[in-house]
């Protein structure tokens, strides 16, 4: 028979869309592939523009999950995906990362569908971070865990995962950046915003632990104003709705040199990072992107889940400490760019064939999971 395997992929946030973009194209090519969007943040700025920028088809299914509360969203994700699992009956189920969307895997587990989890094994060891709980749950219910690094693989093995079900694939982000290199280099976003290369700071902050408390959002306002005052340069802030809401609610006052902007598309945001004097972010992707593209960056978190990035010191971690941020920016000012780089790329972030690996792994392990775990 020439029947194609049925694979279902679930996503719901920008990082998932970006990282999965090249994988999705391969899954569309080789399998009967269903792409499900949980509806978490599906609007033009947060999601739709990324599908356009990355050349992806519109999702086949929208769960239209409410985001009124995290627990309500999680409940809806699990209950709504169940309907489509029963209808489509996929042979395999793929998720990436640690967002609430990944918890759709709980429904797949109940249906005894083989679960493949990309970006498995990441740990920040900070229980205040909501994603830490998510990633532990998804790792431990997944059948095949696909890690970016040996460190992540070792974490899973130390937690009792069977070695034959943990596979290091490397990060998919380098392949995505390479696929869109021409578009990134041709971006006109600096001209559009009247910015000069290496003469502005780029900031992106959205994590719950950073922006949801009054104390921290006030700190963020103070550090933005301090950077603007010290260097007399524009500070461009890519404004996530969560951050915008907190700034408004807490009446944070910002200097005129602080430029608040709605979230950028993938192409323009990468171009802004490359051409910034430095990028300050609490994003999970900052370690990888700064390592691959060699732009100066600070990670504004107190804990992170990518220690392999620190082995090459690709990014410095400062939290929201103004004194550490200022010292960090001073160090970054001497960072060599382009071919003269002295901060070397992290090997685990440099793979350009992850999208080829994933379909092969899925094809190889569906029967293995069914026979060895579910005794089908």
Please report, for each region that a protein language model flagged, where it lies by residue.
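Short alpha-helical donor nucleotide-sugar binding micro-motif in glycosyltransferases
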Residues: 81, 85, 271-276
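A nucleotide-sugar donor-handling region in carbohydrate enzymes
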Residues: 40-45, 64, 141-216, 318
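N-terminal glycine-rich anion-binding loop in soluble enzyme alpha/beta folds
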Residues: 29-59
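A donor-sugar binding/catalytic signature common to diverse glycosyltransferases
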Residues: 95-96, 102, 117-118, 145, ...
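Active-site and donor-binding regions of nucleotide-sugar-utilizing enzymes
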Residues: 8-11, 16-26, 30, 50, ...
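C-terminal amphipathic helix plus adjacent low-complexity
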Residues: 336-376
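Donor-nucleotide binding loops and adjacent catalytic segments primarily
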Residues: 40-43, 48, 185-275
């Amino acid at each position: 028979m020439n029947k194609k395997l049925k694979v279902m992929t679930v996503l719901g946030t920008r990082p998932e869309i970006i990282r999965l973009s090249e994988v999705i194209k391969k899954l569309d090519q080789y399998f009967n592939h269903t792409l499900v969007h949980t509806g978490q943040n599906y609007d033009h700025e947060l999601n739709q523009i990324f599908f356009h920028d990355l050349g992806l088809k519109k999702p086949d299914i929208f769960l239209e999950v409410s985001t009124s509360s995290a627990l309500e969203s999680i409940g809806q994700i699990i209950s709504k995906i169940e309907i489509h699992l029963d209808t489509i009956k996929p042979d395999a189920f793929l998720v990436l990362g640690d967002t609430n969307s990944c918890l759709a895997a709980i429904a797949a587990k109940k249906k005894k569908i083989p679960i493949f989890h990309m970006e498995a094994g990441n740990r920040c060891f900070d229980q205040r971070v909501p994603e830490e709980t998510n990633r532990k749950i998804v790792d431990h219910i997944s059948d095949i865990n696909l890690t970016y690094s040996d460190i992540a693989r070792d974490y899973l093995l130390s937690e009792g995962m069977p070695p034959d079900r943990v596979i290091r694939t490397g990060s998919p982000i380098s392949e995505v950046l390479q696929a869109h290199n021409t578009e990134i280099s041709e971006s006109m976003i600096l001209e559009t915003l009247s910015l000069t290369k290496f003469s502005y700071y780029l900031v992106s902050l959205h994590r719950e632990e950073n922006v949801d408390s009054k104390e921290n959002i006030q700190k963020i306002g103070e550090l933005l104003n301090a950077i603007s005052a010290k260097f007399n340069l524009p500070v461009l802030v890519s404004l996530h709705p969560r951050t915008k809401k907190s700034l408004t609610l807490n009446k944070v006052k910002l200097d005129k040199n602080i430029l608040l902007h709605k979230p950028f598309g993938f192409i323009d945001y990468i171009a802004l990072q490359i051409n910034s004097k430095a990028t300050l972010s609490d994003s999970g992707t900052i370690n990888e992107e700064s390592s691959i593209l060699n732009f100066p960056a600070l990670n504004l978190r107190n804990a992170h889940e990518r220690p392999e990035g620190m082995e090459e010191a690709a990014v410095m971690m400062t939290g929201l400490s103004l004194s550490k941020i200022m010292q960090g920016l001073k160090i970054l000012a001497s960072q060599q760019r382009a071919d003269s780089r002295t901060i070397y790329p992290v090997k685990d972030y440099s793979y350009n064939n992850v999208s080829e690996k994933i379909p092969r792994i899925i094809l190889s392990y569906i029967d293995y999971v069914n026979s060895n775990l579910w005794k089908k």
